[in-house]
């Protein structure tokens, strides 16, 4: 008799439909949260596509960025940028966004602010001035050291054919 009771005690009763439904909703909610966090994090990461900023960071590294406009929210004010900041901007001379350091700030004859940028590994400044409207983001730094995740961007470069 004792053996029969143990077998019955070990059997798990089927979950009622309400518990299964709640469990499924929690699982779906978990996946939605993971996807949203991934999207938000992806908005704050950028893959380095060239060696122009070596040895600060290398091709295939991922840098943490502060965007100028994230979902309509002004996260970074370009007028707060200073010499030494590393920015990502839409260049008129290159098809991909460029990640370079601000080496000088100028006021144009039109009264607008323009930035002179240069890759740390390049011998000369970039060929044209950068307007505040071209700036997409600033690389986040802690104690003058940019936040870099080494080499994990190679997969993205391979997929994009860069």
Residue positions per predicted region:
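Extended, hydrophilic extramembrane loops/domains of integral membrane proteins
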Residues: 112-156
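Extracytoplasmic/periplasmic/luminal assembly and interaction segments
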Residues: 71-110
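Extracytoplasmic
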Residues: 43, 58, 82-84, 97-100, ...
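A residue-level detector for short acidic-glycine micro-motifs
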Residues: 50, 104-106, 137
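Protein maturation boundaries and topogenic segments
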Residues: 1-76, 80, 144-162
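Surface loops and adjacent helix of pleckstrin homology
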Residues: 68, 92, 120
